[in-house]
């Protein structure tokens, strides 16, 4: 039996095409993936992300524990509500998962991890927490709705109470705040402004309906994938996994090397990889006809005339740009051109930073 979110019936009411997503019945689209994509880039769309795993880490050792668990450093979070993005690494510096951590108080952090990795993540966190004075509590009774797009905040404001709007007024990106029964965060997976709203399950359907009534377009997994790829955001299991270190996944910016005495899990292995040099994740742009796809080989020749090979990790047609884009893991000698093998012939592609669209505009 597949898991169903509390919003399952709301999806059916909007004629969603449901698919299995790592054991969850989730909407692929509600008729047109392209229209849903454009709604987020041009107006406002919303996603049911209630399958995500919310974990509260509470106790006197919460900060110390998360400083060991994560490659990024939660001690950098000084203002209540501030969040950071991090990899959670194994001893070999492989990425167990990528996640967001919110600093709420010195003894209370909220961590949001992926759904596909839930059991593995919870087991790892439980194992590593031994000896720390903390409690780790999963919050399955909470649903989550992401409202994204240039008009998302205004449309959400029409649904929030006056007190809730006052609580989040002027909130900067990458913050979260408890406002009444809602935990409202300025985070997302689309490259647009908006909120991710954690809501008690018994209020989720009413919130979804209220957003629908404000003209927020429901969006499925299809649009979520094209939006996140345009924004250059990794998908766990495709762009990185336990065989990949964060330096090879365009996540170097999420590693807090200082202070040098913070012994986070995987640090020694990661330092060795850094010193030896690793592959890197780049963006590819192909303006010819055709679509770049996961697992296609990428070829380039370095300055010495030696040919190297990499592989596409994620690829799609970009509805915003009108041509194909991809992320690829390649040796770090790559320049600004390469070739991709498609239908037994090689096609030229441009190599760019893995960030294609931000706030509705081309970003490279």
Curated annotation (Swiss-Prot):
It catalyses: N(6)-[(R)-S(8)-aminomethyldihydrolipoyl]-L-lysyl-[protein] + (6S)-5,6,7,8-tetrahydrofolate = N(6)-[(R)-dihydrolipoyl]-L-lysyl-[protein] + (6R)-5,10-methylene-5,6,7,8-tetrahydrofolate + NH4(+). GO terms for cellular component: cytosol; glycine cleavage complex. Keywords: Aminotransferase, Transferase. Its EC number is 2.1.2.10. Disulfide bonds: none annotated. It is an enzyme of class 2 (transferase). One of its GO terms (biological process) is glycine decarboxylation via glycine cleavage system. The keyword Transferase applies. It comes from the Bacteria. GO terms for molecular function: aminomethyltransferase activity; transaminase activity. Pfam families: GCV_T, GCV_T_C. Belongs to the GcvT family. PANTHER family: AMINOMETHYLTRANSFERASE (PTHR43757), AMINOMETHYLTRANSFERASE, MITOCHONDRIAL (PTHR43757:SF2). The glycine cleavage system is composed of four proteins: P, T, L and H. The glycine cleavage system catalyzes the degradation of glycine. This is Aminomethyltransferase.
